[in-house]
Each structure stands twice: as structure tokens, then as C-alpha cells.
Amino acid sequence: MQTRKTLSWIKEEITRSISVSLMIYIITGAYISNAYPIFAQQGYENPREATGRIVCANCHLANKPVGIEVPQAVLPDTVFEAVVRIPYDMQLKQVLANGKKGALNVGAVLILPEGFELAPPDRISPEMKEKIGNLSFQSYRPAKKNILVIGPVPGQKYSEITFPILSPDPAAKKDAHFLKYPIYVGGNRGRGQIYPDGSKSNNTVYNATAAGIVSKIIRKEKGGYEITITDAPEGRQVIDSIPPGPELLVSEGESIKLDQPLTSNPNVGGFGQGDAEIVLQDPLRVQGLLFFLASVILAQIFLVLKKKQFEKVQLSEMNF
């Protein structure tokens, strides 16, 4: 009897342990899979520094172009498109975290004026939904609905990203005004060269941390190298560890200098930023402008008719 109770207790403990382990795995896996797009969010309160530099450039060191297209003017409480273009050569392959080659991903941050925000799904037209595809946008911070981020997403499918934006209504939001506003955008393609903690990724060049002779190169079992540099006068040895991915440029017996590149630079991506302007237009001002234009056109018509009437009178007097 005692043996049965013991076995039953052991089964319960094993089942409980498996359940807890599974829950931890699911939670941890979800966190890891969702962590990559929010690297900047974890480290910076605001993605745009006082100098105008967008913080993504701190990890993506290469400079690449990015484009943005928005309407010149929008009316209050209107949904419009902000199209971000991240061009690159689709044939390029980047170094992945495991050292293998793979396709490039893209990502973007869109900094809108205060009051502008992501349009709710029920306000987005079917045509715009088709352009958006399966993209899922999120706010940079819960309290900063005007700053939107997206990525990483497959670059071959989403090198052009359409953001559905809702303009504010000054009649409902007292802090919104009918003005011209700036919009800032940052877009990257490919992996970064530096992680948020300051450490290097395997998608960058590795330099020698000491001058001397390359006395030994060991190829690691999981990829990458350990390079031993011996300082000839002192006999001091320094070991530089190279992760899998970059190609080695030096060989044993070679004399190298401090900060000399030990590897190639495998990075094929980069980050770019740009800006645009948009006017939140007052409908009354538009109506006033239309009324003014209509008045001018009518005045021109009346002048032409009056001129023709005057010419007829003159002609009749001459005939008389």
C-alpha cells in the first residue's frame, strides 16, 4: 500500500515538473521571439535623439537610403497612407547568427506628430489592407501612440511598408492644431553590427587587439576562430576570438598591427533615416478657398459677358 502511494506521489511530481518546464519554455520562447523588434525600445526612452539622429543607427553602422511618401495635406479624422521604402539588392545574402548565409530582414520606425496614430482596423479600407498585408505594427511605448515600429520582417516581401495613419481632430483634441508638421522615419535592412549591450555581433569586422605575430590559428568546432597573437619583444600572448561568419584575412606567421582587420566585413545591410512634411488642413479654410476660387471664376465670366455686351453696343452705335 505504501509503495502504491509512493509511486502515485512520484507520478504527480513528474507531471507537475513537466508542466512547469513546459510553461517556462513557452513563456521564455515567446519572450525571445518578440525581443528582437524591441531592442531600441528597451534601451531608449525616445528613438530620436536631440541631435536628430535615430537611435537605430547606434547598432546598424552602415549608412543606406530610405524613403517616405505621405500626402501633402490631410483633413482631420482621416485615414491616410505613409509609405516607407527600404531599397536594397534582393540578391544579397547576410550572415546569420549561426554563421550561415540567409535572406535580409527589414524594419522601420515612424515618428509622427503628436495626435497622429495608427488607424484602427475598422477605419482601414480593403484596398489599404491589401497593401499592408500581414504586417503587425506596435507603438514604441504605450503612452507614445504617435511612434510606430515594425520588424524584423522579410525584406523580399516588405521592402515597401504601408503604415495606415489616422489624423487627429482638433475639435476633439485640444492639443491638436491646424499646422504643418514634420514626420521622421528610420529604416534598416539586415542585422546590426552591435548589440544593445555594446558587444559585437558576427555581422561586422574584427580587428586585432594587439600587435605582433600570428602564432596560432585554431578553428573552433562550432565555427569561428581563436587567433593567438604573440608580441615578439615581450613574448606576451593575446587570444582574439572570432565568431562564425566573417572570413579570415590573416594566416599563421603573419606580422600584424594593432587594430588591423583580422576578418572581412560581412555586413551587406545598413540603416537610413529621412523626413517629410504634412499639413493638417482646416476644412473651413478649404471651403473658403473653394468659395474664393469660385468667386474669381464667376467674376471672370461676368467680365467677359460685360465686355461682349459693351462691344455689341459700340457696334450698334457705329452702324447707326
Curated annotation (Swiss-Prot):
Parts of the chain that traverse the membrane = 286-306
Q: Which Gene3D superfamilies match?
A: 2.40.50.100, Cytochrome f large domain, Single helix bin
Q: Which cofactor does it need?
A: heme
Question: Which free-text remark accompanies the cofactor?
Answer: Binds 1 heme group covalently.
Signal peptide extent:
1-35
Query: What GO biological process terms are annotated to this protein in UniProt?
Result: photosynthesis
Q: Which domain of life is it from?
A: Eukaryota
Keyword Transmembrane set for record: yes
**Entry's Gene Ontology cellular component terms:** chloroplast thylakoid membrane
InterPro entries, per this entry? Cyt-f_TM, Cyt_f, Cyt_f_lg_dom, Cyt_f_lg_dom_sf, Rudment_hybrid_motif
Which compartments is it annotated to reside in?
Plastid, Chloroplast thylakoid membrane
Q: Name one Pfam family in it.
A: Apocytochr_F_N
Membrane topology, as annotated? Single-pass membrane protein
Subunit description: The 4 large subunits of the cytochrome b6-f complex are cytochrome b6, subunit IV (17 kDa polypeptide, petD), cytochrome f and the Rieske protein, while the 4 small subunits are PetG, PetL, PetM and PetN. The complex functions as a dimer.
The family annotation for this protein states: Belongs to the cytochrome f family.
- Task performed by this protein: Component of the cytochrome b6-f complex, which mediates electron transfer between photosystem II (PSII) and photosystem I (PSI), cyclic electron flow around PSI, and state transitions.
Tell me what this protein is called.
Cytochrome f
The species is Populus trichocarpa
Task: List the gene name.
Answer: petA
